[in-house]
Structures are given as structure tokens and as C-alpha cells.
Amino acid sequence: MLLCDSCNKGWHIYCLSPPLKHIPLGNWYCLECLNTDEETFGFVPGKCLLLEDFKRIADRAKRKWFGSGTVSRTQIEKKFWEIVEGSGGEVEVMYGNDLDTSVYGSGFPRIGDQRPESVEADIWDEYCGSPWNLNNMPKLKGSMLQAIRHNINGVTVPWLYLGMLFSSFCWHFEDHCFYSVNYLHWGEAKCWYGIPGSAASAFEKVMRKTLPDLFDAQPDLLFQLVTMLSPTVLQENKVPVYTVLQEPGNFVITFPKSFHAGFNFGLNCAEAVNFATADWLPYGGSGAELYRLYRKPSVISHEELLCVVAKGNCCNNEGSIHLKKELLRIYSKEKTWREQLWKSGILRSSPMFVPECADSVGIEEDPTCIICQQFLHLSAIVCNCRPSVFACLEHWKHLCECEPTKLRLEYRYTLAELDMMVQEVEKFGGCKTQETKISQRPSSGTKRSIALNKKEGMQVSQARPADKWLLRASKVLDAAFSSVEYATLLKESEQFLWAGSEMDRVRDVTKSLNKAKIWAEAVSDCLSKVEGEVNDDSMKVHLEFIDELLRVNPVPCFNSGYLKLKDYAEEARKLSEKIDSALSSSPTITQLELLHSEVSRSPISLKKHEILSKKISSAKMLAKRAKRYLTDAKPPGIEMDALFKLNSEMLELHVQLPETEGILDLVKKSESARDKSNKVLTGSLSLENVEELLHEFDSFSINVPELNILRQYHVDTLSWISRFNDVMVDVREGKDQRKLISDLSSLLRDGASLGIQVEGLPLVEVELKKASCREKARTVYTARKSLDFIEQLLSEAVILHIEEEEIFVEISGILSTARCWEERASTILENETQMYELKDLVRMSVNIDAVLPTLQGIENTISSAETWLQKSEPFLSATSSMASSPCSMLELPVLKDLVTQAKLLNVQLQEPRILETLLLNCERWQCDNHQLLQETEDLLDNAKIDDGTHSNILPKIMDLITRVDSARRSGLALGLNFDELPKLRTASLKLGWCCKTITLSSSSPTSELLEDVGKPSLQHIQQHLKEGQTLEILPEEYYLGKRLMELKDTGLEWAKRARKVVTDSGALALEDVFELISEGENLPVHAEQELQSLRARSMLHCICLKPYNSRSMVSCSQCGEWYHTYCLKLHWRPKAYVCSACCPLAETTPQIDPARATEPERPSLNQRRTRMVATDAAVNDLKWKTRKHIKRTTKRSPQVHILPWFFT
């Protein structure tokens, strides 16, 4: 027993999957604990992600390892193997592998997929049927996988793979050693490492040698896809390794039993599937044996695949060679094990269940071995103690503890059938091999005696009992039937049936025994039922079954009941002929019932018995229905079709019924009623004719459709006449016209749809027109109508002779008043008129009850004039006040539109002339200001400054500024929002800027400039240029700006040189420094701060005669001079120091305390940073505060400044 070091459960080492040969060293964990351990190596199921989320995680992983810069693939590959070998740190990535394309979709088009509109149908069909389409490749002609009936994910149905950086697939080969093809759709490349199939054994040896502990604990480690080993290690151990870099659009094919591994350089998407050509078959057999060895469940049954391919003849000549070799291998293996089981005492056998689709490979029918987990297609061992558990022939001893005699061999093919399968493949392939020649067996046509002198081994030992069995079987077949002896012989024959063609005679005799046993038992069973007087018809024996038994010739065996059964069958046939005779004539119900009673007493079931029963039942049912039709009560509602159907059924039944004559009379009367009704319907229907026919068939109970139509016509006509009389009374009494119209309309509509002609219909139509005309006249008072409507209404009244009625006389007066108003309105609209006249016409129209056509034009004219006055009000107000605030500026285009619209008004007004005057003033102002703006632009473009010329330009500019401001004020006074107002303001500001530019750029160096009086500073120049940028003035476009830019560039260039000299630590000679100072003093711009820094630079210090810098210095306590500590060779700054000039007799260096002669400790990082910041800041504001006055004359060091930057 092997104990798990986690759960402490015990396991037999031979029961493990795969079994272990010995107890492994170190800790060992069972499969359950390995699957539940969260920190185990390998792959862990991840969560479900959307593609966008997966992309985001992939990008984040790549940035984590290599940042956002570019990285070569060589660097990525190196880092990957460093991580694998443990020196590159830990990495956790996600790999979307084994995604079923039937669920998530394929990257290749499929026939069932919806075609995008952008792809043409021909191209789509071409790619759907392409052999390089991975959905088609497994089932192509020549592929062994086309024999598989079901779709197997990853084998016959492609899988999708979504990878990211460092996601990998470990060393493995495909299931069943299949070929595989992988296509990269998009993304980063995929790196492959491959081992040739010929070096697979060497590869496994190196893996076991390198990782002995893992393989001792898990011998099937390479099946788990969790082991990665560097190609370098494999190559060092003489294992050939090849590398392939797969780019998008590339196919990669792996060969059978070829170990391969790899990883992804980044986010990508690939698709892969398996396929198997005929040369794969030997590798497939090797793979199946590996599954058996390691007790791993296989994907398909390799033996079933071979049999299906062999029976289907789907291999060519070259493929048949590989197929024959594999069939011979499984034949030899099956033959050896079956013979060993026979020797071990397993004599019972039975054929396996044959599936419905035996011509294709399935995955659900075959059982699996309880030990090695393999499909049991060819044979299996089973025991009655556990009938649902099976074992293969190799592991039969582990099935149960029962004796071998209680076990049973189940087989799908006999050895003879397998041998025939090999010969068929050989015949189809067209070639023979030495192996197939050896495998051939004698045909089944050999004599019963087997030549024992030509047999050896197992065949000899099995042939002797077979001969004995055949001898016994011959005697039993010649004797009378005995169920016990037959069962014994059949049970004993099971030990021979699975064998080869040498047992064909046994199989033939067994079939004869089975046939005889089935026939004899059937005869005995039938005879027992016939003689047992069974009353239940369902338990009787059918005559057809007895005839089938009696037709067997010759009889398989002797049975004493055969002749008795023959006599019973003869009596049943005579009774059947009697039934035929009765049915062919026209019997009565009584005769049929007597015959039915005789048939029911027969011990044999006749098929015509049921026909006779149905005949009697139908006759009784028809007679019952006929009596109901012919009863004295004569119930109404009998349909004519039902009567005709009953008559037809009674005639077709061929049974004599007393009700037949009565039904026939009803049928004749119905036909007569139908013919007369049709004759009336086809002619001109009058009320008298219809009433005459209905009176004739008043008491007829059959529903004749045509007669029913006439009855309905008659009822509808009588109802309409009654309504007509009532409405005519209302017409004469002059009731409500609206209700009268409704009643007359309904009456007219119903009368037109009557099937019978009525006389009052024209009168209804005339009265309806009159009522409608009166109702229209009434609406003139409720809602105004047009003059055309009123004229038409009066015309209708004249036609209907009702024009003298009071309402139509009043309407005629309204029409005359409206005509007079229209004539006056037309006259006014033809000429311009005053507003009050138009409004008088509108007031008059209120009292006229009609729609006046010209009224809308009058109202539109008034509305247009009022709208124009409302829009003009702001301009009229601005004209009167002669001022407007900026927030209420009016637009000039609006004014122009108003002046144009005024010309279209058909009203006499004073306001349009006022707006025309205002528009003329505005256009004159625009013309004047256009010239002023052009003059300003010319002055700015052409102004030049020379020595003494600025005195001539400035007055012109000032005069122009005055004129521009005056024009702007006059434009504001007009109260309109002119486009020129902002331009005038900008021109004024630009002219002011030019004045200031002339002032800054025209200062000439005079004697006053020695004291920096009159010079502009660089800050002032830059500020002024920024103000010009705000005004959108580009200095390079104007001469004045160019001159100012030159001054700025000159000052900045000198300041840059000065800054460089100040910080050069004394590199520049003093003469050059003084020359630079002189140059700066003569600059046309003010640079005092830079000059002070240069003057400070000209001060030299220390014995090195260098200017001040940021390095450590010490001051003399007497003269105040500064010295560099490194020039004095001091390791630290003393509290007090006296220089050699002040103390010439002293030593060069002061006495230093020996205890402090060592260099102090290095300060901390924070202290050093603080000192550096302080040192930089000291450059700007250091002052020689520690200098002291001494006897000899010295100068204090001025404050030192860093030159400022003036770059914008």
C-alpha cells in the first residue's frame, strides 16, 4: 500500500493510473490532492473573460515585463527560458486554450455560417470548401478520421487558442499520435520547438533523467502537458530540437509522435485541429498501447477505427499496406489472448451487441475496461456477479474473484471474420505480403473432420473436442426434438464459435441447432395454445404464423405435434373461405352475426375476423342513424350533405337494411327542393314567386342550402318593407333631418343589398337627397361656408324644387351681401391706401356669415405692415436719440432688409423714408472709414526709423490716431453694429504700439547712457513684444518690429556670453572680461544686473587667482580675503584661519589638531542633498558677510548673481 502524504489514504501501486513498479522516494500525493492543491504546478482554470478584457490583461502583462519600449524576440525568448529555469522570477499569465469553435465560432468560413454582405458568394463558397479550411481537413478523402461519426472537439472540430506574452504549451504529442495542423489568424508570433518522432524515445529518457522525482511519482507526466524543459538541455543530451517561428497566416503541421512545445510572443489567436492519413495507422496503434500502459482513457477506439476503415474500403493501394499491418497486429493479439483464455477455462462466449451505425466510429456504444480504461470493441470479459462491469482480455484476472468457468467472453467478430477482413483489404489493395499469406485460413467449405496431423498447438487441442461435439450434434438432429439436449449442445458450442475458419463447421451446425430449436419450440407453443381453448382473441395464434411454420421444408427436426397443428390450420382456412363468401354477397345483419359467433369459437385467430366485426358494427351504426332520420318526430336540422353521405355509405356497405328505401325517398325530395330553388335564384326574384316556393316546402325537415337562402331573402324583404313604411311617416311629418338622413341612408343601403326587388327604393333615394340638402343649409349658420358652396347649395335646392323654403331664401340674402363686400375689397387692394380703410373692411366682414376670399389678403396686408413697423422700431428709436449703447447695437444687414421690404408694402407710411436716410448715412460712414483703415495699414507697412527720422513719423501717427478715434465715435453714434468698429479699435491700438516701439528703438547712445539713462531694458522690450503678439502683430512683418527684434537679439546674445563667462571658474582672461564689460556698457539696451555679475567675475581670490565659485572656501580672520580649502590642502574648514600674507612668519599651514587630522565621515544622503541645494542657492545671494577690515587695503567681494534667462 502507498499512503498519500496529504490525505493519508492508501492505494495499491498496481491499481494506480498508471500503475507504479515500486514505492517512490520522498513525498507522494494522490491525484485527488494534486487536483485540489492551489499551489501545484501546471495550469489552473481561469475565469470567463470577454476578448476586450483579455486584450487589456495581455497588454498589461507585456508592459510589466518590458515596459512600453520595443523589445526583440530574442530578448523575449531568453527571458522566457530564464523564467522556466527559475532565474527570471515568477510569472502568471492567462491562456485561452481549447475553445470549442462550434460554440465560439471559427476563423474559417463554414457552410452553416451567415455570409457577410461584403463578401461575394463565389469567394465565400470557395473558402468554405477549401481543403486548407481546418473545418474540412479532418474529413478529407484519405483521412482516417472521416470514419468518425460524432464530432470530437479538438480532433475533428477545431479548437481556438487565445494567447498572451509567455503563455505556453508544454512538451507533448497529440492524442493517439495524430497529425495536427495549427493556423495563426492574427497577433504576435508563436515560437515552436519540435522533436522528430524518431527521437521520441531519446527525448523521454532525457526527461526522466533530468526530472527523476517527478516521473517516479507520476509516470504519466508527459500526458499532463505541464512539463517544460529547455531545448538547450535536450541538445546537450544529443536530442535534436528544431525551432519554427509562426507568423500570422502561417500553417504549422506536427507529425505523429513528434513531441512539441512553445510559447507566444504576445497577444494572438490561433486555430488547430487533428487529421490522420493512412501512414498514421502504426503510430495510432502505438498510441493506443501507451494509453493502455498508463491506463488513460482514449479519445476513440483504435480497433473500431481500423474495422470501419477496412469495411468501408476507403484506403488506396499505399494506405492498404499500413491498414493490413495494423489489422494483422490486432488479429494476432486477439487470437493469442482468446486462446489463452480458453486454456484458462473460460469456455462461455457470446456475440456483442452490434450498434445501429456499424459503418462509422462512435464514442458511446462500446464499454471500457475497468482496469486500463480502454474501449472494448473487439472483445471483453464479463461475469454474472457484476454484469455491468467489463475487463479487457489482458486484465481479466482483475475483474472479480469468481472462477474462470463463470466468466464469459463477449466478442464482436470471430477470428474467421477478422481474418476475412484482412483478406478483403489485401484484395482491395492489390498486393500481398508475407504476413497476409501466413494469416490465411482454410475456407468454411472443408469437411466436418479436421485434419489433425496438419495442426499444432491450440488448434489441435480445440479440434478434438470440436469433432466430438459435431458427432453428438448430428445424432441429436436425427433424433426427436429434446429441448434439454439442444440447450446443452448450444451452450457447449460457445467455446468454439469465436475461433477461426477451422471452426466454420461448428458454427454451421450451431446455426442449424438454433434454427431447429426455435422451429420446434414454436410448433409446440402453437399446439398448446390451440388445444388449450383460449377465449381471449389477443392470446390466440394467428393463422399466418402457423402457415409460416408449416411452410418450412424440409422440417429442421422431428416434432410429433406437427401433423396435429396442420389439421387445425386446415379447419381455420375453411372458416376463412366462408367469411369471404359471406362478404362478397349482400347478407343481412343477422346472417353476419351468426358467422361472427362461429369465428369467435375457433381456437385460431383469423385476420378476416376483424373485418367481419367492423362490417357488423358499421351496419348497426348506419341503421341507427337512418331510423333517426325516418322517425315520425322528424327532428329539424338534418343537413343535406349528411343525408347524401348516409345514403352512399349504406349502398357501399353491401348489407341488407330495412331503412334503405326510406332514406332514398328523402334524398329524392331534397334534390327536388334544390333544383326548384336554383331555378328561382337564377331568374328575376319577386316576392310572390319566393312565397309560393316556400309554401310548397314548408314542412320539409332537410336543410337544403338553396332553400334556406330563399327563406332568408323572404325574411329580410318583409323586414325592409316594415321599416320603409315607418320612415315615410317621419318624412311626411318633417321630423329631425339629421335622424331622417341616417334612417334613409340605412334604408337605401339595405334595400340595395336585398335579394328580392322592392318598389319603394327610388322614393327613398329622392327623399334622402332632399333631407341632405336641408341639413347642408343648416350648417351655413353653424359654420361659415365658402361662396361657391352656398351657390352650389342653392342650385341643388332648385333642382329638388325646395328653393322657396324659408331657409334657402335667407341663404340667398347672405350671398348677395358677400358679393358687394368682395367688390369693394378688390378695389382697395388694387391701389395703396391708408391703414384705417383696411381695418374698416375687416370690421365689416364680421357681420357676414360666409367665407370671404379677399379677407385673407386684407388681413395679410395689415399684418405685414404692423410686423414691418415692429421690426423698424429699434432703428427709428436710434434715429431719434442719436445714441446707442454697445449692448443694443443694431445690424446693418437688417436695416437694408427693412428698407427693401418697405417697398413691397401696399400701405401708405412715413417710416420707410426715415430708414432710407439712416441707411445712406451708414454707407457714407463705411466708405470714409475704409480709406482711413487703408491709410493706417500703409503707414505701418512703410514706416522706417533712422537717426532723426522718428521726429517726422511720430506726428503723423498721432494725427492718424486722433482721426481713427473720431471715426470710431461717429460710428458708435449711428447706433449700428458695424464690422469696421473692431477694426478701428485694433488700428488705434496698433498705432499706439508703434509709437511706443519708436520710443524704445530710437534711443541713441549719448553721454547720458553712461549712467544708463534713456536705455530700454530687455524686460521692457520683451513685454512690449508680448503686447504686440496680443494685438496679433508679427514683428517680422513691419519694419519697426524688425528693428525692435534686432535690439532684443543683440541684448540676449550679449547676456548669454556674460552668463557663460560668470560661470567659467576663471577660464577667460581678465582682459577679455573687461572687454566684455565695456561691450555691455555700450549696448543700446539696459543690462545692469549682468554688468554687476561680470564686475564681480573680474574680482580674483585665493592663491590660485580664480574668481568666486561654489566650492568650499575659508576667510582670513585678519584681512578678510577668501581662500579655497582645497588650495590650502585643508580637509575641513577651521573655525579661525590666518593667511600667509597676514602672518608671513608662520608656517604655510596652520597647526592642526592630530585628533582631527582625519577626514570626517561621509554624510547621509539627505544631508548631502540639503548641502547641494544650499550650495546652488548660495550662488544667487551669497554675500561676503564674514570679511573684516584689516590694515592692508582690500576690497569687499560684491554680491554675485546668476544671469537671468530671457528666453520666452
UniProtKB/Swiss-Prot annotation:
Signal peptide: none
Residues bound to Fe cation: H172, E174, H260
Pfam hit, one: JmjC
Annotated effect of mutating H172A: Abolished histone H3 'Lys-4' (H3K4me) demethylase activity toward H3K4me1, H3K4me2 and H3K4me3 leading to ectopic increase in genome-wide H3K4me1, H3K4me2 and H3K4me3 levels and a better dehydration stress tolerance
SUPFAM superfamilies, per database record: Clavaminate synthase-like, FYVE/PHD zinc finger
Biological process according to GO: abscisic acid-activated signaling pathway; developmental growth; negative regulation of gene expression, epigenetic; plant organ development; regulation of stomatal closure; response to abscisic acid; response to water deprivation
GO CC annotation, single: nucleus
Zinc finger (PHD-type): 1-36, 1099-1145
Annotated Zn(2+) 2 binding sites: C369, C372, C392, H395
Catalytic activity, reaction form: N(6),N(6),N(6)-trimethyl-L-lysyl(4)-[histone H3] + 2-oxoglutarate + O2 = N(6),N(6)-dimethyl-L-lysyl(4)-[histone H3] + formaldehyde + succinate + CO2; N(6),N(6)-dimethyl-L-lysyl(4)-[histone H3] + 2-oxoglutarate + O2 = N(6)-methyl-L-lysyl(4)-[histone H3] + formaldehyde + succinate + CO2; N(6)-methyl-L-lysyl(4)-[histone H3] + 2-oxoglutarate + O2 = L-lysyl(4)-[histone H3] + formaldehyde + succinate + CO2; N(6),N(6),N(6)-trimethyl-L-lysyl(4)-[histone H3] + 3 2-oxoglutarate + 3 O2 = L-lysyl(4)-[histone H3] + 3 formaldehyde + 3 succinate + 3 CO2
EC number(s) from the headed UniProt entry: 1.14.11.67
Binding residues annotated for Zn(2+) 3, in chain numbering: C383, C385, C400, C402
Manner of cofactor binding, per the entry note: Binds 1 Fe(2+) ion per subunit.
Domain JmjC: 126-292
Name of protein: Lysine-specific demethylase JMJ17
Gene this protein is translated from: JMJ17
